[in-house]
Amino acid sequence: LKKLRATTALAVVVAILGLGLGACGSSSDEGGERTTLRAVYAGFPDYLDPALSYTLEGWTALWNSYLPLLTYAHANGAAGTKIIPGLAEALPQVSDGGKTYTLILRPGLMYSDGTRVRASDFAHTIERLFRVSSSGSPFYADIVGAEHFAETKQGGIPGIETNNKTGRIVIHLNEPRGTFENELAMIFAAPLPSGTPAEDLTAHPPPATGPYVITAVKPGRSWEYERNPEWLSNNAKLLPQLPSGHVNQIDVTVVRNTSTEVNDVEQGRYDWMQNPPPTDRYAAVKDKYEGTQFRTAPQINLYYFWMNTKTTPFDDPEVRRAVNYAVNPAALERIFAGQLTATQQILPPGIPGYKKFVPYPHDMAKAKAMIAAADPSDRQVTVWTDNYGQNKEAGEYFDGVLDELGFETTLKVINSDNYFTVIGNLSTPSLDTGFANWFEDYPHPSDYFAPQLTAAGIQPTNNTNWAQFDDKALSAKVDRLSREHLGPKQLAEYTALDRAYMRQAPWVPFGSLTLSTFVSDAIDLEDLVISPIFGQDLTSFEFK
């Protein structure tokens, strides 16, 4: 998705959001009921190793194979953000002022290779994150002893206590962490057998606990799923809260031309493309197939322009507010061909604490008057964006808005593969303003404040606070709230923070991208589940 301290991975999510799943037919389907889903991705996922994957495409691919102790409900919309027990019997007991989490592993669970799932596998899994330098390891760095283990790679992590006889898992944190249940539900933390090598296993993914196991991987080209042999005979009975899936096999092929994908799905050669149709065909596909073979679903993400609050002209809040008035989110909706829903606030739709408000209704005349009154001493501005799809056009639009406001602009368009690396390096010259987006790590409002709008996010490299915004009072509130469990009081405070940050206007938020799903006429679209976190749910695909 994605994010927190893994900025490069976020760039990948954005750069290849158009990806989906795919493959050719199976002879086992011929002459009988269809049991093989043929799907298409526009590009291969970053990894097919649960310790390493950090993109929406990878998480879609892995979600129904690697089950964490906690997980999310298999449901559309807000219902899909509810944390439920996964391999654990129940949600954790939290004690010691929020610093100790106790869970019990369900007895009798098996991996797809016939190995029994043990409590100690969880400890090994977290240790493996640090051994392979996973982008997900920072989420678990607050476990007692984790930072020392990250340096030495020896001796285990003392803050994780396990008992294989009872299934008891006790996790001790250095300090309370209100997001820790969400982090236990991330695919990074899905238990793997204790002997799993500390290396990238994309070509030969590790044994699975979920209904599908990944097989026959050809990196960069294709992979397949088969039913986990231990699922229906064993794990499904122990995990009744999780769906088993309808198809017996899923064949996935990479087809990099998205227009070709559309043709193939229309003609029934493939059953599903996860990525949206290309911009020049999106409206036609939507108009023809919406409700029968095409639908959109909200995803929790935010697209915005950041402004460097440390240097002129954007060190002046009045200038930043003026720019917010000048940008027209409706124009950006058109640029994104209807795939983006306009918004003007930090918290995106779907995240807890979100309450819609419109702080800066479009008013170019007012914006020009505010700039004239502020009279910034330096009007030379470099505008940054990447070259992927509509991101480039959005940057060009923003460049034009600033030009109309009287700034002397220089537009820099960077390859999407390293865009966030470049703007995340504070030694890069002229980091004045530019495009960014953020796909949630998990549905918690802290994810939109702590890494992007506090001092903690400002780093010499891998910087995620591109506005370099640090309001001491607001940062202190974010820090305090991030240690508390979400309740009505905390949600109200996050809602208030949204407004407080937008009064300071470090960003120009303009929209949230929706996820499009296009299937063949053989698929039952009505019952398809599109998770707001993981995308299309493989267990929900069913032939008519």
Model-found features: residue ranges?
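Ligand-site clamp/hinge motif
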Residues: A198-A203, W231-A284, E408
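Alpha-helical secondary-structure segments
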Residues: V117-E127, T166-H172, G210-P211, S244-Q249, ...
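Surface-exposed binding/hinge segments that line
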Residues: I104, R116, D121-A123, R131, ...
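Extracytoplasmic/peripheral linker and loop segments enriched in polar/acidic and small residues
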Residues: G25, P92, R321, E408-F420, ...
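Append "and occasionally in soluble cytosolic enzymes with long acidic Gly/Pro-rich linkers
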Residues: E226, S233, D315-L405, Q468-D470, ...
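N-terminal lobe/hinge region of extracytoplasmic solute-binding protein
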Residues: V40-D96, P207
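Long beta-strand-rich cores associated with HINT superfamily self-processing modules
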Residues: T517-K544
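Gly/Pro-rich hinge or "lid" segments in bacterial periplasmic/extracellular proteins
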Residues: H74-A78, Q154, P176-Q249, A365
